[in-house]
Amino acid sequence: MIKTGSDFSGVGAFDQALKKLGIDYKTIYACDWDKYARQTYIENYGDPKYFPKDVYYREIPKESLDIYMTSPPCQAFSLAGNRKGENDERGVLFYNSHEFIKKNKPRYFIFENVKGLLSDDSGKTFKRWLDYLGKSINGNPVIFPLKQCANYHVYYKVLNSKDFGVPQNRERVFIVGIRDDADNTFSFPKTQQLNKKLKDILEDSVDDKYYITEKKIKYLLRTKGTTFNINENILTDKMPLTSRTIQANYWKGARDNQYIKTHSLYPRSSKTGKGGTGHLSKEDGTSYCVDTGNSQAVEFVGKNIRRLTPRECFRLMDFPDTFKWSVSDTQAYKQAGNSIVVNVLAEIINKLNL
Protein backbone atom coordinates (compact mmCIF):
# COMPACT_ATOMS: atom_id res chain seq x y z
CA MET A 1 0.00 0.00 0.00
CA ILE A 2 1.43 3.36 -1.00
CA LYS A 3 1.21 6.45 1.20
CA THR A 4 -0.13 9.62 -0.40
CA GLY A 5 -0.72 13.25 0.48
CA SER A 6 -1.89 16.38 -1.27
CA ASP A 7 -2.14 20.13 -0.91
CA PHE A 8 -4.99 22.05 -2.57
CA SER A 9 -6.78 18.71 -2.69
CA GLY A 10 -10.06 20.03 -4.08
CA VAL A 11 -12.55 17.25 -4.71
CA GLY A 12 -9.93 14.56 -5.07
CA ALA A 13 -8.89 14.18 -8.72
CA PHE A 14 -5.69 12.64 -7.33
CA ASP A 15 -7.71 10.03 -5.43
CA GLN A 16 -9.83 9.35 -8.50
CA ALA A 17 -6.71 8.76 -10.60
CA LEU A 18 -5.34 6.26 -8.07
CA LYS A 19 -8.69 4.48 -7.93
CA LYS A 20 -8.88 4.37 -11.72
CA LEU A 21 -5.49 2.63 -11.80
CA GLY A 22 -6.54 0.20 -9.07
CA ILE A 23 -3.69 1.31 -6.81
CA ASP A 24 -3.98 0.40 -3.15
CA TYR A 25 -3.22 3.61 -1.27
CA LYS A 26 -3.58 5.29 2.10
CA THR A 27 -4.19 9.03 2.40
CA ILE A 28 -1.86 10.30 5.10
CA TYR A 29 -2.67 13.91 4.48
CA ALA A 30 -4.96 16.18 2.46
CA CYS A 31 -5.46 19.93 2.65
CA ASP A 32 -8.01 22.41 1.32
CA TRP A 33 -9.41 25.64 2.71
CA ASP A 34 -12.73 25.59 0.81
CA LYS A 35 -15.42 24.16 3.10
CA TYR A 36 -17.56 22.97 0.19
CA ALA A 37 -14.66 21.20 -1.50
CA ARG A 38 -13.82 19.56 1.83
CA GLN A 39 -17.42 18.45 2.15
CA THR A 40 -17.39 16.84 -1.30
CA TYR A 41 -14.00 15.26 -0.65
CA ILE A 42 -15.16 13.61 2.57
CA GLU A 43 -18.40 12.53 0.91
CA ASN A 44 -16.43 10.54 -1.67
CA TYR A 45 -13.31 9.33 0.14
CA GLY A 46 -14.00 9.63 3.85
CA ASP A 47 -12.22 11.88 6.32
CA PRO A 48 -8.42 11.70 5.89
CA LYS A 49 -6.15 10.95 8.80
CA TYR A 50 -5.04 14.59 8.77
CA PHE A 51 -7.12 17.19 6.90
CA PRO A 52 -5.98 20.76 7.73
CA LYS A 53 -7.51 23.79 6.05
CA ASP A 54 -4.54 26.09 5.57
CA VAL A 55 -1.16 25.29 3.98
CA TYR A 56 0.39 28.11 6.00
CA TYR A 57 -0.38 26.45 9.33
CA ARG A 58 -0.50 22.75 8.57
CA GLU A 59 2.00 20.36 10.11
CA ILE A 60 4.11 18.40 7.67
CA PRO A 61 3.73 14.65 8.33
CA LYS A 62 6.93 13.00 9.53
CA GLU A 63 6.42 9.79 7.60
CA SER A 64 7.71 10.22 4.07
CA LEU A 65 5.08 9.87 1.36
CA ASP A 66 5.28 7.79 -1.78
CA ILE A 67 3.47 10.44 -3.84
CA TYR A 68 2.74 14.06 -3.01
CA MET A 69 0.29 15.95 -5.23
CA THR A 70 0.00 19.73 -5.29
CA SER A 71 -2.01 22.12 -7.44
CA PRO A 72 -1.80 25.70 -6.12
CA PRO A 73 -4.55 28.12 -7.19
CA CYS A 74 -4.08 28.96 -10.86
CA GLN A 75 -5.86 32.32 -11.06
CA ALA A 76 -2.62 34.26 -10.58
CA PHE A 77 -1.22 32.80 -13.80
CA SER A 78 -4.33 31.98 -15.79
CA LEU A 79 -4.63 33.43 -19.29
CA ALA A 80 -8.29 34.02 -18.43
CA GLY A 81 -7.46 36.06 -15.34
CA ASN A 82 -5.57 39.23 -14.45
CA ARG A 83 -2.24 37.38 -14.41
CA LYS A 84 -0.64 39.10 -11.43
CA GLY A 85 1.64 36.10 -11.03
CA GLU A 86 3.72 36.16 -7.88
CA ASN A 87 2.36 39.64 -7.11
CA ASP A 88 -0.88 37.82 -6.29
CA GLU A 89 -0.76 36.14 -2.86
CA ARG A 90 -2.05 32.96 -4.51
CA GLY A 91 0.96 33.03 -6.81
CA VAL A 92 3.42 32.39 -3.98
CA LEU A 93 1.67 29.33 -2.55
CA PHE A 94 4.14 27.26 -4.56
CA TYR A 95 6.69 27.91 -1.84
CA ASN A 96 4.50 26.12 0.72
CA SER A 97 4.59 23.08 -1.56
CA HIS A 98 8.35 23.48 -1.95
CA GLU A 99 8.71 23.52 1.84
CA PHE A 100 6.64 20.34 2.09
CA ILE A 101 8.79 18.58 -0.50
CA LYS A 102 12.05 19.59 1.20
CA LYS A 103 10.93 18.47 4.66
CA ASN A 104 8.85 15.38 3.89
CA LYS A 105 11.00 14.12 0.99
CA PRO A 106 8.28 12.15 -0.86
CA ARG A 107 9.48 9.54 -3.34
CA TYR A 108 7.59 11.31 -6.12
CA PHE A 109 5.71 14.56 -6.43
CA ILE A 110 3.35 15.84 -9.10
CA PHE A 111 2.69 19.53 -9.57
CA GLU A 112 -0.09 20.89 -11.80
CA ASN A 113 -0.89 24.42 -12.93
CA VAL A 114 -2.12 26.46 -15.88
CA LYS A 115 -0.10 26.90 -19.04
CA GLY A 116 0.14 30.65 -18.33
CA LEU A 117 2.67 29.87 -15.61
CA LEU A 118 5.27 29.26 -18.33
CA SER A 119 5.11 32.83 -19.58
CA ASP A 120 4.65 34.69 -16.28
CA ASP A 121 7.28 37.42 -15.92
CA SER A 122 8.75 36.41 -19.29
CA GLY A 123 9.30 32.86 -18.07
CA LYS A 124 11.31 33.86 -15.00
CA THR A 125 8.74 32.60 -12.49
CA PHE A 126 8.64 29.09 -13.95
CA LYS A 127 12.43 28.92 -14.21
CA ARG A 128 12.71 29.97 -10.57
CA TRP A 129 10.27 27.26 -9.54
CA LEU A 130 12.23 24.64 -11.44
CA ASP A 131 15.45 25.87 -9.82
CA TYR A 132 13.85 25.44 -6.40
CA LEU A 133 12.85 21.87 -7.23
CA GLY A 134 15.35 20.24 -9.54
CA LYS A 135 18.95 19.05 -9.51
CA SER A 136 18.19 17.96 -13.06
CA ILE A 137 15.49 19.22 -15.41
CA ASN A 138 14.11 17.05 -18.21
CA GLY A 139 17.21 14.87 -17.91
CA ASN A 140 19.72 17.74 -17.97
CA PRO A 141 21.81 18.27 -14.80
CA VAL A 142 21.72 21.69 -13.18
CA ILE A 143 25.35 22.84 -12.98
CA PHE A 144 24.97 25.10 -9.94
CA PRO A 145 21.86 24.09 -7.96
CA LEU A 146 20.39 26.64 -5.57
CA LYS A 147 20.99 26.23 -1.86
CA GLN A 148 17.20 26.03 -1.46
CA CYS A 149 16.90 23.33 -4.13
CA ALA A 150 14.87 20.27 -3.14
CA ASN A 151 17.30 18.14 -5.22
CA TYR A 152 14.81 16.15 -7.27
CA HIS A 153 15.04 14.94 -10.82
CA VAL A 154 12.37 17.09 -12.40
CA TYR A 155 10.45 16.64 -15.63
CA TYR A 156 7.84 19.02 -17.01
CA LYS A 157 5.51 19.17 -19.98
CA VAL A 158 2.27 20.82 -21.11
CA LEU A 159 -0.45 18.22 -21.62
CA ASN A 160 -3.89 18.67 -23.16
CA SER A 161 -6.78 16.55 -21.89
CA LYS A 162 -8.10 16.05 -25.43
CA ASP A 163 -4.93 14.05 -26.12
CA PHE A 164 -5.83 11.63 -23.33
CA GLY A 165 -9.30 10.47 -24.23
CA VAL A 166 -11.29 13.37 -22.75
CA PRO A 167 -13.23 15.70 -25.11
CA GLN A 168 -12.11 18.94 -23.50
CA ASN A 169 -9.44 21.36 -24.71
CA ARG A 170 -7.64 21.92 -21.42
CA GLU A 171 -3.90 22.56 -21.39
CA ARG A 172 -2.03 22.28 -18.11
CA VAL A 173 1.63 22.15 -17.20
CA PHE A 174 2.69 19.15 -15.12
CA ILE A 175 5.92 18.90 -13.16
CA VAL A 176 6.99 15.46 -11.97
CA GLY A 177 9.72 15.16 -9.35
CA ILE A 178 11.62 11.95 -8.59
CA ARG A 179 13.77 11.41 -5.53
CA ASP A 180 17.39 10.30 -5.97
CA ASP A 181 16.84 6.78 -4.66
CA ALA A 182 13.83 6.14 -6.93
CA ASP A 183 13.95 5.11 -10.57
CA ASN A 184 14.42 8.51 -12.21
CA THR A 185 14.11 7.38 -15.83
CA PHE A 186 10.80 9.03 -16.56
CA SER A 187 8.96 9.97 -19.72
CA PHE A 188 5.55 11.56 -20.01
CA PRO A 189 2.74 9.38 -21.38
CA LYS A 190 2.12 9.23 -25.11
CA THR A 191 -0.95 10.89 -26.51
CA GLN A 192 -4.04 8.84 -27.27
CA GLN A 193 -6.57 8.95 -30.05
CA LEU A 194 -9.74 10.76 -29.01
CA ASN A 195 -12.64 8.38 -29.53
CA LYS A 196 -15.14 10.23 -27.36
CA LYS A 197 -16.91 13.39 -28.44
CA LEU A 198 -18.71 16.01 -26.44
CA LYS A 199 -22.07 14.52 -27.37
CA ASP A 200 -21.04 11.32 -25.62
CA ILE A 201 -20.93 12.99 -22.21
CA LEU A 202 -24.40 14.56 -22.37
CA GLU A 203 -27.06 13.40 -19.95
CA ASP A 204 -30.17 11.75 -21.37
CA SER A 205 -32.59 13.58 -19.11
CA VAL A 206 -31.95 17.16 -18.03
CA ASP A 207 -33.97 19.28 -15.63
CA ASP A 208 -35.84 22.22 -17.15
CA LYS A 209 -33.86 24.63 -14.97
CA TYR A 210 -30.85 24.21 -17.27
CA TYR A 211 -32.78 25.54 -20.29
CA ILE A 212 -33.44 29.17 -21.11
CA THR A 213 -36.90 30.23 -22.16
CA GLU A 214 -38.18 30.17 -25.73
CA LYS A 215 -38.71 33.93 -25.52
CA LYS A 216 -35.04 34.54 -24.75
CA ILE A 217 -33.98 32.12 -27.50
CA LYS A 218 -35.98 34.04 -30.12
CA TYR A 219 -34.45 37.27 -28.91
CA LEU A 220 -30.94 35.86 -29.10
CA LEU A 221 -31.38 34.44 -32.58
CA ARG A 222 -32.77 37.76 -33.83
CA THR A 223 -29.96 39.80 -32.35
CA LYS A 224 -26.96 40.53 -34.55
CA GLY A 225 -24.48 43.37 -34.79
CA THR A 226 -22.24 44.84 -32.16
CA THR A 227 -23.66 44.40 -28.68
CA PHE A 228 -26.84 43.35 -27.00
CA ASN A 229 -28.17 42.93 -23.51
CA ILE A 230 -29.93 40.32 -21.44
CA ASN A 231 -31.17 41.62 -18.12
CA GLU A 232 -29.13 44.75 -18.79
CA ASN A 233 -25.86 42.81 -18.98
CA ILE A 234 -23.74 43.37 -22.08
CA LEU A 235 -22.86 39.93 -23.33
CA THR A 236 -20.42 40.29 -26.15
CA ASP A 237 -19.09 42.35 -28.99
CA LYS A 238 -19.63 41.12 -32.57
CA MET A 239 -20.84 37.76 -31.38
CA PRO A 240 -21.61 35.28 -34.17
CA LEU A 241 -24.97 33.59 -33.70
CA THR A 242 -25.84 30.32 -35.35
CA SER A 243 -27.76 27.26 -34.24
CA ARG A 244 -25.09 24.80 -35.37
CA THR A 245 -23.12 23.59 -32.44
CA ILE A 246 -24.48 20.58 -30.67
CA GLN A 247 -27.51 19.77 -32.74
CA ALA A 248 -30.10 17.09 -32.37
CA ASN A 249 -33.28 16.43 -34.30
CA TYR A 250 -35.38 16.30 -31.19
CA TRP A 251 -36.90 18.39 -28.42
CA LYS A 252 -36.45 17.35 -24.82
CA GLY A 253 -37.98 13.91 -25.17
CA ALA A 254 -36.03 12.22 -27.99
CA ARG A 255 -32.38 11.26 -27.75
CA ASP A 256 -31.36 10.08 -31.23
CA ASN A 257 -28.94 11.27 -33.91
CA GLN A 258 -27.00 13.74 -31.82
CA TYR A 259 -24.12 15.27 -33.68
CA ILE A 260 -21.71 18.16 -33.51
CA LYS A 261 -21.33 20.42 -36.52
CA THR A 262 -19.64 23.74 -35.78
CA HIS A 263 -18.49 25.86 -32.91
CA SER A 264 -18.95 29.46 -31.94
CA LEU A 265 -19.61 31.78 -29.01
CA TYR A 266 -23.04 31.90 -27.45
CA PRO A 267 -24.63 33.63 -24.49
CA ARG A 268 -24.14 31.67 -21.33
CA SER A 269 -27.48 30.63 -19.93
CA SER A 270 -27.15 31.12 -16.21
CA LYS A 271 -30.16 30.48 -14.03
CA THR A 272 -30.98 34.17 -13.94
CA GLY A 273 -30.44 34.72 -17.66
CA LYS A 274 -27.38 36.81 -16.87
CA GLY A 275 -23.81 36.17 -17.79
CA GLY A 276 -21.31 36.61 -20.58
CA THR A 277 -20.64 34.28 -23.45
CA GLY A 278 -19.93 30.58 -23.37
CA HIS A 279 -17.75 28.59 -25.72
CA LEU A 280 -19.48 25.67 -27.36
CA SER A 281 -18.02 22.58 -28.93
CA LYS A 282 -15.25 22.63 -31.46
CA GLU A 283 -15.46 21.07 -34.89
CA ASP A 284 -13.41 18.13 -33.65
CA GLY A 285 -16.07 17.39 -31.07
CA THR A 286 -14.21 18.64 -28.03
CA SER A 287 -15.30 21.11 -25.40
CA TYR A 288 -13.53 24.31 -24.51
CA CYS A 289 -12.01 24.42 -21.06
CA VAL A 290 -14.43 23.93 -18.17
CA ASP A 291 -14.21 26.98 -15.92
CA THR A 292 -15.27 27.66 -12.36
CA GLY A 293 -18.36 29.77 -13.04
CA ASN A 294 -21.97 28.67 -12.84
CA SER A 295 -22.66 29.67 -16.46
CA GLN A 296 -20.95 26.85 -18.28
CA ALA A 297 -20.75 26.32 -22.02
CA VAL A 298 -24.20 26.25 -23.54
CA GLU A 299 -25.46 23.77 -26.10
CA PHE A 300 -28.28 23.55 -28.57
CA VAL A 301 -30.80 20.76 -28.18
CA GLY A 302 -33.17 21.05 -31.10
CA LYS A 303 -34.45 24.59 -30.71
CA ASN A 304 -33.65 24.71 -27.02
CA ILE A 305 -30.52 26.23 -25.52
CA ARG A 306 -29.17 25.01 -22.23
CA ARG A 307 -26.01 25.08 -20.21
CA LEU A 308 -24.02 22.01 -19.33
CA THR A 309 -25.12 20.32 -16.12
CA PRO A 310 -22.72 19.80 -13.22
CA ARG A 311 -22.64 16.07 -14.00
CA GLU A 312 -21.64 16.80 -17.59
CA CYS A 313 -18.88 19.13 -16.37
CA PHE A 314 -17.54 16.43 -14.06
CA ARG A 315 -17.66 13.98 -16.96
CA LEU A 316 -15.53 16.44 -18.94
CA MET A 317 -13.05 16.20 -16.05
CA ASP A 318 -13.20 12.38 -16.36
CA PHE A 319 -14.89 11.86 -12.99
CA PRO A 320 -17.02 8.70 -12.96
CA ASP A 321 -20.77 8.85 -12.48
CA THR A 322 -20.27 7.26 -9.05
CA PHE A 323 -18.77 10.58 -7.94
CA LYS A 324 -21.26 12.39 -5.72
CA TRP A 325 -21.86 15.80 -4.20
CA SER A 326 -24.52 17.49 -2.11
CA VAL A 327 -23.50 21.11 -2.68
CA SER A 328 -25.29 23.67 -4.84
CA ASP A 329 -24.89 23.78 -8.61
CA THR A 330 -22.81 26.93 -8.20
CA GLN A 331 -20.34 25.11 -5.96
CA ALA A 332 -20.37 21.98 -8.14
CA TYR A 333 -19.43 24.01 -11.22
CA LYS A 334 -16.65 25.68 -9.26
CA GLN A 335 -15.36 22.34 -8.02
CA ALA A 336 -15.30 20.82 -11.50
CA GLY A 337 -13.56 23.87 -12.97
CA ASN A 338 -10.92 23.91 -10.24
CA SER A 339 -10.13 20.22 -10.55
CA ILE A 340 -7.67 18.21 -12.66
CA VAL A 341 -8.67 15.93 -15.53
CA VAL A 342 -8.50 12.49 -13.93
CA ASN A 343 -7.21 10.47 -16.87
CA VAL A 344 -4.30 12.84 -17.53
CA LEU A 345 -3.23 12.44 -13.92
CA ALA A 346 -3.75 8.67 -14.06
CA GLU A 347 -1.56 8.34 -17.15
CA ILE A 348 1.24 10.28 -15.43
CA ILE A 349 1.02 8.19 -12.25
CA ASN A 350 1.04 5.04 -14.35
CA LYS A 351 4.48 6.02 -15.66
CA LEU A 352 5.95 6.10 -12.15
CA ASN A 353 7.70 3.05 -10.77
CA LEU A 354 5.44 2.56 -7.75
PLM feature spans:
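Extreme N-terminal starter segment of soluble prokaryotic enzymes
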Residues: 1-4
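Class I SAM-dependent methyltransferase "Motif I" SAM/SAH-binding loop
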Residues: 8-11
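A short, Lys/Arg-enriched amphipathic alpha-helix followed by its capping loop at the start of a domain
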Residues: 17-26, 44
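Conserved SAM-binding motif I beta-strand of class I
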Residues: 27-32
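Short alpha-helix immediately C-terminal to the canonical SAM-binding loop
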Residues: 35-39
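Conserved SAM-binding strand-loop segment of SAM-dependent methyltransferases
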Residues: 47-54
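Class I S-adenosyl-L-methionine
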Residues: 57-67, 74-282, 288-289, 305-306
